[in-house]
């Protein structure tokens, strides 16, 4: 049965094993599949140059279905039956917290890639968990600062998924918006469950509330379904929309010409940002292997593998304590630009982009235009804030 759960390239027994967990089915599958592909590309590149410490990397992959218990079960199987050296991946924020707890108990390093709750590297921090991707504070704060430039936006409404990610994003967005505009009002909120089929009641509630702007943290297939259902009601013309991860290329491709123009959106990485040689090389290699533009999730999977590989090389060993020490403060030049795993909290520190949806004749889908880049120091929670959170949890 176990052989049916895991897919991996066949290597010798002395490979360095990464136990990958990704949603490979259902509405979250675009995130999981492309994250897995990005990780596979990194493994291929590193192995083509001899691997690490003379050993090949091996990525095991399993469908965690974006389910918390599934992630816990897979993590334990990977460690106890497959003998993985690292846990890797995860899209669901709730799932990442559960996997991090397994990593802590088993004393195995977990490299989170997509799941972005601040709680993972802040209130529930543990020394075995690192994040190679963006966290909620970077995302929500950047969106709030970008939206604050529009002085006509005073009344805000929320629609977000009813779990850790959605609720945290709304609280962070409100706090930063209130800081920028003390007169801002937050007039309502809606919390649909993940993966529901019908958003009609939520759309009608938004129309009745008549906000100036809606903050939306639906993502992946849920965001695609919501936009398709909401567009006939004219909601995207009647109010401004601020959509976290709305610049996701997998969402843009799924919607095609149905994507509304002028949405304020973010993306943790974009295939034409930054315009660097490193990013251009990544896009070229990814498109050669997968015949598609890389998503942010692909970049986060790719980055996570490179962080682990460089740390193992730096440590000169697979000893957990030595690899942790090598990961702490590690800085790499990645497709997203220069990025550092902060020593204190193990959170990735890198620049962040927000813009608006536009159409460009060069692409068959909407892209992110009118972009503004926010330095990590301006939007990521500070080390002092992290220390206060740690003290409060003792």
Please report, for each region that a protein language model flagged, where it lies by residue.
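Extracytoplasmic "Venus flytrap"
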Residues: 16-38, 62-69, 91-94, 159-167, ...
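Segments of small-molecule ligand-sensing domains
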Residues: 288-298, 307-374, 394
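Hydrophobic alpha-helical segments within soluble ligand-binding/sensing domains
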Residues: 71, 132-156, 167-168, 196-200, ...
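An alpha-beta-alpha
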Residues: 128-190, 213, 308
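Beta-alpha junction/loop-to-helix N-cap segments that form part of ligand/metal-binding clefts
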Residues: 30-37, 51-122, 132, 191-199, ...
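Periplasmic-binding protein-like
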Residues: 78-91, 111-113, 157-160, 210-220, ...
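Extracellular/periplasmic periplasmic-binding protein-like sensory domains
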Residues: 227-302, 313-318, 368-393
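Extracellular/periplasmic bilobed ligand-binding domains
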Residues: 170-268
């Amino acid at each position: 049965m176990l052989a049916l759960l895991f897919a991996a390239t066949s290597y010798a027994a002395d490979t360095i094993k990464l136990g990958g967990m990704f949603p490979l089915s259902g509405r979250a599958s675009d995130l999981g599949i492309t994250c897995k592909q990005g990780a596979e590309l990194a493994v291929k590149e590193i192995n083509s140059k001899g691997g690490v410490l003379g050993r090949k990397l091996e990525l095991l992959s399993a469908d965690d279905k974006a389910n918390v218990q599934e992630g816990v079960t897979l993590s334990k199987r990977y460690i106890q039956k497959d003998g993985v050296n690292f846990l890797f991946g995860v899209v669901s924020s709730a799932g990442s917290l559960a996997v991090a707890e397994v990593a802590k108990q088993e004393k195995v390093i977990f490299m989170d890639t997509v799941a972005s709750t601040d709680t993972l590297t802040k209130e529930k921090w543990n020394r075995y968990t690192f994040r190679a991707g963006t966290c909620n504070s970077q995302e929500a704060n950047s969106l709030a600062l970008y939206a604050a430039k529009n002085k006509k936006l005073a009344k805000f409404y929320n629609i977000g998924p009813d779990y850790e990610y959605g609720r945290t994003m709304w609280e962070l967005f409100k706090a930063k918006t209130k800081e920028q505009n003390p007169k801002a009002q937050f007039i309502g909120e809606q919390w649909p469950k993940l993966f529901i089929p019908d958003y009609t009641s939520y759309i009608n509630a938004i129309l009745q509330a008549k906000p100036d702007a809606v903050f939306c943290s639906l993502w992946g297939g849920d965001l695609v379904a919501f936009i398709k259902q909401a567009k006939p009601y004219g909601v995207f013309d009647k109010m401004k929309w601020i959509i976290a991860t709305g610049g996701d290329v997998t969402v843009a491709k799924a919607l095609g010409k149905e994507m509304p123009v002028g949405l304020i959106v973010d993306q943790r990485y974009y295939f034409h940002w930054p315009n660097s040689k490193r990013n251009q090389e990544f896009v070229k290699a990814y498109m050669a292997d997968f015949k598609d533009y890389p998503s942010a999730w692909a970049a986060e999977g790719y980055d996570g593998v490179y962080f682990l590989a460089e740390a193992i090389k730096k440590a000169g060993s697979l000893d957990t304590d030595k690899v942790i020490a090598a990961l702490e403060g590690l800085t790499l030049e990645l497709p997203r630009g220069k990025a550092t795993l902060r020593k204190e909290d193990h959170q990735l520190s890198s620049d962040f982009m927000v813009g608006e949806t536009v159409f460009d004749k060069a692409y068959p889908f909407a892209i992110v235009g009118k972009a503004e880049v926010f330095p990590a120091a301006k939007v990521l929670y500070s080390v002092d804030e992290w220390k206060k959170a740690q003290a409060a949890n003792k």
